[in-house]
Amino acid sequence: MHPRGALRPVHRRGGRVFRALLALLAAVLLGGCAIAVDSGGGSSGGGSGSSGTDSPIDSVNRADLDEDERGAVSATNAYWRETLPDDFRQSYRPPRVLGGYVGEDGPSCGGQPSVPFNAFYCPSQDFLAWDENLMAAGYERIGDAWVYLIIAHEWGHAIQARLRADQVSVAAELQADCFAGATLFGAAERGLLRFERGDTQELQETLAAVADDYPWTNESDHGDARERISAFNQGAQRGVRACLA
């Protein structure tokens, strides 16, 4: 999965290509497969994902990871810059993107410290941040779709903060998954990013990673694999309005 122009231009062939991708994604995801992506240092122990001596960030090509993070931010921002005014008739102001931190060195939100191996949106200060070790662990074991999905999901929480209260679901995490599906497939339809071979499999594995002990993939917070897959597919197949409460 790459931003437009990163490899070669996207050739627009209508909706058939993306409907085929969606059908493949649904067929694979609903098969009930779940994986565990460890941090590269054994059990994550109580959800911190910080055990072991080697950090996942040390095991990946930082330049490639940084490029995908920038690409995900760019495509997601461009999608919502068009979508919020067009679909919701309101002006769009992007959240701040503080980007990556490592371990316990992340920004605080409302006086609360950031959590290792997590990605989050801070509503009181309107910013997104993520632990680079979380990104690197999934990037190494799954692929770049991990990065795109996490950023699109957290951006979805920023969008929730911009909507009317009656448009925000009480199942906020699943609605953010729905927004992520609408974002990634909507951005691809518009030529803002391009899907590559294997991206649908990577999306499957990312959504199924609720078996992990990472805070970002905590089942009690985000829903089980089937709930997350269903929410993502709803947005991917039907667009952002299907995600509204």
Predicted segments with their positions:
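Long, well-structured alpha-helical subdomains associated
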Residues: 189-245
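Short, low-complexity, disordered segments immediately C-terminal to signal peptides
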Residues: 34-57
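C-terminal motif of bacterial Sec signal peptides marking the signal peptidase cleavage site
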Residues: 29-32
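An active-site-proximal "capping" alpha-helix that borders the catalytic cofactor pocket
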Residues: 81, 171-186
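Catalytic glutamate of the conserved HExxH
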Residues: 147-162, 178
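Catalytic zinc-binding patch centered on the HExxH motif and its immediate surroundings
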Residues: 38-42, 101-129
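Short pre-active-site segment immediately N-terminal to the catalytic Zn-binding motif
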Residues: 132-149, 164-170
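Catalytic Zn2+-binding segment of zinc metalloproteases
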Residues: 155-170, 183-188
